[in-house]
């Protein structure tokens, strides 16, 4: 009996390239022995609903073609199910942080080849209150950039759109007084932003978490303490080289669980989408999701292989 695969794709991602190549992808999967069907999302939340339906239909594999937001929705659809299908990822978004972390090819047919080869690893995901994430959670005005940037601008200039929007928002940066509890430790004070990372790549910064491990059960907690615009600019420059962890205004820790609260409002970002406001409780779910990765790429700096 052939394995069944369900493709969940965002038809607007990647300048609609995947939609045009879908027939070729289906033929390739069928030739490889998979009974494959596809579903196109139309609005936010559709990928979550469809992935839950795919669980009820006992699909062995879900293939996600879209950006980090589409992948996040699929993860939220299957995370609470005891028998979760393996996930194949075809990176079609603007930045594709998760795809970068796993060294997935951006060429559609090469990404399909990775899935067909069948090499997979188990990776951690995070839970924030009642929702899940696979790449990062963050808080602070600057973290609004990813979901405040218009789709038209992203289509026109690609990842550079985030830098344009970020420069526009810099004058609006504010520090917020927070309490952060993590694995028995406590930080209390004013911060500009915090990041909780599961991978090494966030918003296109591939060295933001230079010692990332995708399956060790730990978040990387980055706290940028009260800072002015000049200090923030310096920290961001250092972050492009992975040297921000040495800056005196940066706290860099590993934690399995984190609780953050404040009497002030602080917007949250979950895998590039708006995640509400504080307070928030974060829990790392170790090796919770299984994903396909290139077998010829040594992820020694990222994945702890047995």
UniProtKB/Swiss-Prot annotation:
Pfam families: DAGK_cat (PF00781), YegS_C (PF19279). Homodimer. Its cofactor is Mg(2+). Catalyzes the phosphorylation of diacylglycerol (DAG) into phosphatidic acid. Is a key enzyme involved in the production of lipoteichoic acid by reintroducing DAG formed from the breakdown of membrane phospholipids into the phosphatidylglycerol biosynthetic pathway. GO terms for biological process: phospholipid biosynthetic process. GO terms for molecular function: ATP binding; ATP-dependent diacylglycerol kinase activity; metal ion binding. This is Diacylglycerol kinase. One of its GO terms (cellular component) is plasma membrane. The gene is dagK. It comes from Staphylococcus carnosus (strain TM300). Its EC number is 2.7.1.107. InterPro entries: ATP-NAD_kinase_N, Diacylglycerol/lipid_kinase, Diacylglycerol_kinase_cat_dom, Lipid_Phosphate_FormReg, NAD/diacylglycerol_kinase_sf, YegS/DAGK_C. It comes from the Bacteria. It is an enzyme of class 2 (transferase). ATP binds at residues 10-14, 41, 67-73, 94. Residues 1-132 form the DAGKc domain. Mg(2+) binds at residues 213, 216, 218. The active site is at residue 273. Binds 1 Mg(2+) ion per subunit. This ion appears to have a structural role and is required for catalytic activity. Keywords: ATP-binding, Kinase, Lipid biosynthesis, Lipid metabolism, Magnesium, Metal-binding, Nucleotide-binding, Phospholipid biosynthesis, Phospholipid metabolism, Transferase. It catalyses: a 1,2-diacyl-sn-glycerol + ATP = a 1,2-diacyl-sn-glycero-3-phosphate + ADP + H(+). Coiled coil: none annotated.
């Amino acid at each position: 009996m052939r394995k069944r695969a369900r493709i969940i794709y965002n038809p607007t991602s990647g300048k609609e390239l995947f939609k045009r190549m879908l027939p070729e992808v289906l033929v390739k999967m069928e030739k490889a022995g998979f009974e494959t069907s596809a579903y196109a999302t139309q609005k936010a939340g559709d990928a979550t609903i469809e992935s839950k339906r795919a669980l009820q239909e006992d699909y062995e594999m879900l293939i996600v073609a879209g950006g980090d937001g589409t992948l996040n929705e699929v993860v939220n659809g299957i995370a609470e199910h005891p028998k979760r299908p393996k996930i194949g990822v075809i990176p079609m978004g603007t930045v594709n942080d998760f795809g970068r972390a796993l060294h997935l090819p951006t060429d559609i047919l090469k990404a399909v080849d990775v899935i067909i080869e069948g090499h997979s690893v188990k990776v951690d995901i995070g839970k924030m209150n009642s929702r899940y994430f696979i790449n990062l959670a963050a808080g602070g005005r600057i973290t609004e950039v990813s979901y405040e940037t218009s789709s038209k601008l992203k289509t026109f200039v690609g990842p550079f759109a985030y830098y344009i929007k970020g420069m526009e928002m810099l004058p609006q940066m504010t520090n917020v007084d927070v309490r952060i509890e993590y694995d028995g430790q406590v930080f209390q004070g004013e911060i500009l932003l915090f990041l909780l990372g599961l991978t090494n790549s966030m918003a296109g910064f591939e060295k933001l978490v230079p010692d990332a491990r995708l399956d060790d059960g730990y978040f990387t907690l980055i706290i940028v303490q009260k800072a002015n615009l000049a200090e923030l600019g310096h920290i961001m420059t250092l972050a492009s080289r992975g040297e921000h962890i040495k800056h005196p205004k940066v706290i860099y820790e590993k934690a399995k669980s984190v609780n953050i609260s404040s009497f002030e409002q602080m917007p949250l970002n979950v895998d590039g989408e708006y995640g509400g406001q504080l307070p928030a409780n974060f829990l790392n779910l170790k090796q919770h999701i299984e994903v396909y990765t290139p077998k010829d790429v040594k992820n020694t700096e990222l994945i702890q292989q047995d």
